[in-house]
Amino acid sequence: MAIYHLEAKVVSRGSGRSAVAASAYLSCTNILNDYDGVRHDFTRKKGLVWQEVFLPEFAPPEWKDRGVLWNAVEKNEKTKDSRLAREFVPALPIELTPAQWQELLTDFIQNSFVAEGMCADVAIHDPHPPGHNPHAHIMLTVRPLDEQGNWQYKTEKEYLCVRNGEERGFTAAEFKVAQAD
């Protein structure tokens, strides 16, 4: 029987994390972080089943290399407490085969995130013993890309207000103006 589990995290410099380090961990690779000069080596980590970088069609092709992608993200974010990535860790059903896990994740990521302009770095882990705890790591860029391949603004909060039975969505700036009225 499939057991549901989903963990959602933010990779942020403010919490002492690095997008390059998180990507090296999930892909069991060795990546140099150009931002701080630290090399993150997780090549001895076991249990990697599959890994892939998904890009929108207008992203630079060199970003297929996860080291280049996440170093570009680190370079673009300037502040010491920048949010660098979103990470999701879903459990995978043991009733499915690894090929079915890949198909499930590929469809979900392409339709939910890449179609919205985000880059996704994905890996499936099945630690020892196999079939004991299969799960995926999905890292997403916080900023989507526009059609020219430029970073857009980070997602803006939208507030839903109900007044006299009428619902209306507001961005933070619109909400401040509406409050003044």
Q: Which sequence ranges carry the predicted segments?
A:
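N-terminal nicking endonuclease/strand-transfer module with a His-rich metal-binding environment
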Residues: M1-D181
